């Protein structure tokens, strides 16, 4: 490749090169976003995998929903010991809780168990066959597994690649025409059946299908691949390669049963966030004199959240209609989601530190928090994007999922530190009754602003010393008491904000997750409803607590503190401006007391 000719001077190329290097991480992220997952039409390719169990997918089915599984290639790198068993399992549950048989020891092999409540597909590559073992309740509670060579319900039974739509339509016709045949399946057929598979040089390929024909068969179905070793063989010496395609569909949507309402839910919540942002902008324009920089940052948050929800709804709409997202909409959603997450945690941390409310410069300790929170939040959002765009059965999926949980937990803990530090400063200021030697950042800011006003009135330093010396002791103690009361009131407000953040974290991270595990499969969308509702309530309450209005307890207390300083200075100095101190002389003696006399 020919070298590019240099353009411009070396001095001009330096900044351009540095700017280009700074853009490399963003370009890498965009390249990742440009390859989203295939939605509910899944394709997974594993090469030399050593895992004992691979979770291929989980999907909630309504009546007349179906799944088509096409194993294009499955090959083994067999060790010397042939005592190995591989196959698939199909589990059905009513919610997203953990299946009991999957929580066993790592050496536990479900394929070798005699009595199980799941459907098993056990492969025998040497004999080029697969055995289907169904539990006793398979006739009514579980659907029948159909192979393309068993019953010609998939249209072209001898071809491995089948159109999922035509397969579903043809199968539905077969079920309608042969309903009596399905209902009279003998016990032997429901117990165990064997089917031949295509073997091409040790790589087998086959296709199976099932249809949800009754209401009792509705549920959350999970498909797993298992590798069972004998005589405690090392797992790394026994690898497998798998190329599989899975198509899942409900009657009117490619979305899982619990995800079908999500597009409408996201659009509705986007409207409420947009409405709250509009109201907030109206408040800022109405109270311009009380607005700080942080208020405008808070205004950007609901609009960014609303845009993210709109693009998320569009993304789910295309997945629902065609089984995979449109890349452009997916990329836009991921970008807005990344911005929303970073902006949310930055805003929470800035409010906790009191930036713009009580101080305009962040301390070194505050800056360290932002140096931790911002990269962690970006990493958490990148992990979320990778999870959304990666198939569930890949090796990196579990790693990124665990990383997302850990990083998000660290972010939630880190944003609490600025609030705790502000509370500690206020406690120290309140404990000293407002004495100047231990004033917290709130009192310091009020005094600085009062001092700037004093300078604007052209008071000399000598006048300030005179005012301080002439201030009665009772006035000083009164001011100290008022300052302590102000600090206590601000301390109460920051404690409320701390509780508000903790409740937000609990509702969106813990309670919502427990709800997701507990509710039936068709109500899984309640998890997203609770998460979005809790976020909206958190936005509204935070805006109410720190609203730019004269009746805001936080801002009102700061204003009262400043007014107290100005009233003490301006009123006293205005009276004393034309006064002078004199001593009364009576019969040559000087009286100790003094009084004020007006200067003529």
UniProtKB/Swiss-Prot annotation:
The UniProt keyword set, sorted, is: Cell membrane, Disulfide bond, Glycoprotein, Golgi apparatus, Membrane, Signal, Transmembrane, Transmembrane helix
Pfam families, per the entry: GOST_TM
Membrane topology (Extracellular): 40-263, 315-337, 390-402, 520-524
Biological-process GO terms, alphabetical: clathrin-dependent endocytosis
State which residue ranges cross the membrane: 264-284, 294-314, 338-358, 369-389, 403-423, 499-519, 525-544
Topological domains (Cytoplasmic): residue ranges?
Answer: 285-293, 359-368, 424-498, 545-600
As for subcellular location, the record says: Cell membrane; Golgi apparatus, trans-Golgi network membrane
Listed disulfide bonds for this chain?
109-228
Organism superkingdom: Eukaryota
Where is the stretch described as Disordered? 157-185
Q: Which residues form the signal peptide?
A: 1-39
Name of the protein this chain belongs to:
Protein GPR107
* Organism per entry: Homo sapiens
